[in-house]
Amino acid sequence: MSMQDPIADMLTRIRNGQAANKVAVTMPSSKLKVAIANVLKEEGYIEDFKIEGDTKPELEITLKYFQGKAVVESIQRVSRPSLRIYKRKDELPQVMAGLGIAVVSTSKGVMTDRAARQAGLGGEIICYVA
């Protein structure tokens, strides 16, 4: 069976991995998944990530914990294949009054809502992380 929404699968693996106190989670890799993992690492939500394998690359994400608790409290998919959500720069949402982030896919790449607002860009809202 083919995967209908690989990004939702990635977010679910991260959520389930942290709920089970796993050190790392692995998944099939793609350019978009690597870009999302890079944003999560820059914002401090995950420890690290690496890509392994040549013919079928796997993305391994090392999860982050603080005093035994998961750093990611909630992670949810917003725009999905059946319902894409696009926002202009002045419509970009603030997650938890600025305490969380919205991951946005723009014409200049994948970035946080703050970075997109600063660059004056809108785009597709991929997910919310808090």
Curated annotation (Swiss-Prot):
InterPro entries: Ribosomal_uS8 (IPR000630), Ribosomal_uS8_CS (IPR047863), Ribosomal_uS8_sf (IPR035987). The keyword RNA-binding applies. Signal peptide: none annotated. GO terms for cellular component: ribonucleoprotein complex; ribosome. It holds the Pfam family Ribosomal_S8. GO terms for molecular function: rRNA binding; structural constituent of ribosome. GO terms for biological process: translation. Disulfide bonds: none annotated. Keywords: Ribonucleoprotein, Ribosomal protein, RNA-binding, rRNA-binding. One of the primary rRNA binding proteins, it binds directly to 16S rRNA central domain where it helps coordinate assembly of the platform of the 30S subunit. PANTHER family: 40S RIBOSOMAL PROTEIN S15A. Belongs to the universal ribosomal protein uS8 family. Part of the 30S ribosomal subunit. Contacts proteins S5 and S12. This is Small ribosomal subunit protein uS8. The gene is rpsH.
